[in-house]
């Protein structure tokens, strides 16, 4: 089996927390979720979201995140109150960019949308954001926290390059993509939290790379249903696996070995980020709550012996909000 052949990389499970039942964490995340308004986002309300009498641009960002990046939404709820709305805006910006690729039928249209967001970032730093909910909220975040323009532009530029429907040539190319998107998002989150620390940035770099790799793995069944495969070609070739094997949902050992190798790289990034947690300011830990969902996925895929098409991998963990709150309460990542 794939797991038994390579099992030495995987460390002990961390979500089991001995003695936790003896201490009762304060009510927090679930209460916040219940208090949030929840009407559906419609095209009509989106168009009017920044106008008078609408929910408001902040509510639009929150709803977009809740629907399109639920794990990011849950993590954002546990940030300090003064930072929450800015991170909602930042993550909503990322969602807007991420959904361009799947929402257009022609690359030219995707490039036009990316050009809109490039100009939007430029206009935000000229205090002239367009009348668009996410743009307005992002402008507020930039003004409030003096966010670095370079990180925002890196996210747009990398998403634009990724409009080509090509597999990553190697794991390094996937890591570079993750660094310029997910890690950049974390650098900006640290700025919102008021953290300027080399060790925190180092952790953000590795956690962002782990996030990018896990996202690529999780999306494999969806991409396969659209006749697309984006997994690193070098690892596929190493194990003699073709793109057609993934399109046919082949579950042979060599296919699972490909998934094992890729998942192991995410695991190593996560492990390395945690190896120097004592040197990272505690104030930075809330920015890294996504490690909970990353670890949850890596454990699940290990349990199914790296069968990327196993139905259990597509099921939401209903206990994730609780695990996130516990992680926040324990002040760790």
UniProtKB/Swiss-Prot annotation:
**Function, please?**
Involved in the assembly of mitochondrial NADH:ubiquinone oxidoreductase complex (complex I) at early stages. May play a role in the biogenesis of complex I subunit MT-ND1.
- Per the record, the domain of life is Eukaryota
Q: Which GO cellular component terms are attached?
A: cytoplasm; mitochondrial inner membrane; mitochondrion; nucleus
Which cysteines pair up through disulfides? They are none
Q: Nucleus: present as a keyword of the record?
A: yes
Family listed? Belongs to the NDUFAF6 family.
Tissues where this protein is expressed = Widely expressed. A lower expression is observed in lung and kidney compared to heart, muscle and liver. In the kidney, expression is high in the basal zone of the proximal tubular cells.
Task: Provide the alphabetized UniProt keywords.
Answer: Cytoplasm, Disease variant, Membrane, Mitochondrion, Mitochondrion inner membrane, Nucleus, Primary mitochondrial disease, Transit peptide
Transit peptide residues according to the UniProt entry: 1-44
Full protein name: NADH dehydrogenase (ubiquinone) complex I, assembly factor 6
What gene is behind this protein?
NDUFAF6
Keyword Transport part of the UniProt annotation: no
Q: Name one GO biological process term.
A: mitochondrial respiratory chain complex I assembly
Disorder this protein is connected to according to its UniProt record = Mitochondrial complex I deficiency, nuclear type 17: A form of mitochondrial complex I deficiency, the most common biochemical signature of mitochondrial disorders, a group of highly heterogeneous conditions characterized by defective oxidative phosphorylation, which collectively affects 1 in 5-10000 live births. Clinical disorders have variable severity, ranging from lethal neonatal disease to adult-onset neurodegenerative disorders.
């Amino acid at each position: 089996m794939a797991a038994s052949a390579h099992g030495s990389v995987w460390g002990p499970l961390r979500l089991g927390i001995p003695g936790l039942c003896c201490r009762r964490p304060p009510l927090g995340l679930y209460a916040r979720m219940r208090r949030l308004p929840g009407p559906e986002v419609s095209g009509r309300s989106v168009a009017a979201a920044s106008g008078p009498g609408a929910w408001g641009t902040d509510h639009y960002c929150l709803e977009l995140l809740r629907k399109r990046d639920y794990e990011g939404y849950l993590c954002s709820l546990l940030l300090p109150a003064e930072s929450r709305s800015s991170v909602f805006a930042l993550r909503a910006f990322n969602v807007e960019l991420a959904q361009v690729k799947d929402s257009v039928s022609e690359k030219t249209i995707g490039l036009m949308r990316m050009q809109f967001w490039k100009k939007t970032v430029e206009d935000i730093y000229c205090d002239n954001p367009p009348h668009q909910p996410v743009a307005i909220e992002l402008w507020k975040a930039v003004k409030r926290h003096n966010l670095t323009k370079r990180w925002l532009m890196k996210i747009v530029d990398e998403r634009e390059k990724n409009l080509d429907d090509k597999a990553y040539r190697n794991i390094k190319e996937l890591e570079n993509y993750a660094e310029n998107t997910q890690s950049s998002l974390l650098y900006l989150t640290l700025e919102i939290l008021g953290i300027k620390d080399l060790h925190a940035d180092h952790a953000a770099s590795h956690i962002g790379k782990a996030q990018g790799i896990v996202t690529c793995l999780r999306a494999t069944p969806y991409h396969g249903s659209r006749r697309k495969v984006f997994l690193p070609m070098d690892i596929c070739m190493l194990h003699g696996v073709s793109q057609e094997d993934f399109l046919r949902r082949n579950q042979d050992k060599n296919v699972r070995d490909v998934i094992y190798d890729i998942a192991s790289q995410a695991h190593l990034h996560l492990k390395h980020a945690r190896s120097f947690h004592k040197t990272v300011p505690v104030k930075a830990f809330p920015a890294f709550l996504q490690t909970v969902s990353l670890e949850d996925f890596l454990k699940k895929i290990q349990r199914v012996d790296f069968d990327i098409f196993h139905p259990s991998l597509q099921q939401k963990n209903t206990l994730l909000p609780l695990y996130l709150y516990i992680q926040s309460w324990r002040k760790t990542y």
